[in-house]
Amino acid sequence: MRRLDDRWKVQSECADGTGRRSVYLTFDDGPNPCFTPQILDVLAQNRVPATFFVIGAYAAEHPELIQRMIAEGHEVGNHTMSHPDLSKCGLGEVQREVFEANQAIMLACPQASIRYIRAPYGAWSEEVFTASEIAGLAALHWSIDPRDWSRPGTDAIVDAVLASVRPGAIVLLHDGCPPDESTRSTQASLRNQTVMALSNLIPALDACGYEIRSLPEHH
């Protein structure tokens, strides 16, 4: 199976055609009952939008967080039902992961409009593209990965984004962790660096003349 051989099928930047210095914040692997509310609080305090690529099983466990995301003007995307490496899955399994995640999101919040999918680990394949197209979802990757999941330090996360930012950039951050990793981390400190980094990153991007915006309509 191919992994990003067909890069033209995966959007990793967004040129919105307005000429603005737009940047897009995305969060993977939630919702997490500890850290997602903190991240939503920071976004609300700064009045900026984000897109949350949620794991369907977590959405089913915490529908109130999906509802809060939508109520506060954010977007929810599909990050599969259980976060497998889809490049190792057959088409049937990929379709189940995508469909069940969509279903879980809509059950959690019927007002959600799901436009995008992001493959776990960024592991794209022809099967993922096919399943996404059937589900009416556009494949969305990222252009900046500060590796916040590795807990490199708050300043390191912010500096990594600022060093690579450009108009149309899609920033990858994490508000939770996959099911197979959740038992290996201390919940109390799992994503605290991401929360603190976000509080510093938003004003830093603003100072550099960037505007954090919602993802534009895909074509």
From Swiss-Prot:
Residues the record annotates as the site (Raises pKa of active site His) are D148
Compartment(s) where it occurs, according to its Swiss-Prot or TrEMBL record? Cytoplasm
Instruction: State the top-level EC class.
Output: hydrolase
Q: Domain NodB homology: where? A: 21-213
Which residues take part in binding a divalent metal cation? H79, H83
Q: Does the keyword Cytoplasm apply?
A: yes
Could you tell me the keywords of this UniProt record?
Cytoplasm, Hydrolase, Metal-binding, Nodulation
Q: Which InterPro entries match?
A: Glyco_hydro/deAcase_b/a-brl, NODB_dom, Nodulat_NodB, Polysacc_deacetylase_ArnD
- For the keyword Metal-binding, the answer is yes
Q: Name one GO biological process term.
A: carbohydrate metabolic process
Query: Catalytic site residues?
Result: D28, H174
What is the first-listed, main subcellular location in coarse terms? Answer: cytoplasm
- Cystine pairs annotated here are none
The protein's GO terms of the molecular function aspect are: hydrolase activity, acting on carbon-nitrogen (but not peptide) bonds; metal ion binding
One Pfam family name is Polysacc_deac_1
The EC designation for this entry is 3.5.1.-
Q: Which GO terms describe its cellular component?
A: cytoplasm; membrane
Q: Which residues form a coiled coil?
A: none
CDD domains in UniProt: CE4_NodB
- Which PANTHER family does this UniProt record tie to the protein? CHITIN DEACETYLASE 1-RELATED, GLYCOSYL TRANSFERASE-RELATED
State the function annotated in the UniProt record.
Answer: Is involved in generating a small heat-stable compound (Nod), an acylated oligomer of N-acetylglucosamine, that stimulates mitosis in various plant protoplasts.
What is the similarity comment for this entry?
Answer: Belongs to the polysaccharide deacetylase family.
What is the recorded name of this protein? Answer: Chitooligosaccharide deacetylase
Q: Which organism is it from?
A: Mesorhizobium japonicum (strain LMG 29417 / CECT 9101 / MAFF 303099)
